[in-house]
């Protein structure tokens, strides 16, 4: 199963992220190395949200990420949510569905 971690970023995110970015990126790359985090990054124009794609049997990896993320701990993330995502197309789809 896939899970989307969606961050609503604070208005001053770009100005403040520098001091926390290395720790945040280490956390993300470590989650990727464990096979939990597939992709992640901020949306552009405007930079008001970020989306991280996790895979696993439950949303636990995404929730652990949030609990450890310096962006969340230091107020760069105003709100967050984890949503299950039923992926049906693509090589790594969790529930592949092909045309009949």
What kind of feature is each model-predicted range?
Residues 1-100:
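Conserved, structured core segments of small domains
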């Amino acid at each position: 199963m896939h899970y989307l971690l969606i961050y609503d970023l604070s208005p001053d995110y770009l100005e403040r992220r520098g001091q926390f970015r290395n720790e945040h990126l280490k956390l993300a790359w470590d989650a990727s190395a464990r096979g939990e985090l597939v992709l992640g990054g901020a949306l552009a124009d405007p930079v008001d949200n970020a989306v991280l794609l996790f895979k696993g049997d439950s949303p636990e990896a995404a929730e652990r990420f949030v609990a450890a993320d310096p962006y969340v701990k230091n107020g760069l993330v105003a709100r967050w949510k984890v949503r299950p995502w039923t992926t049906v197309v693509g090589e790594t789809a969790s529930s592949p569905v092909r045309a009949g």
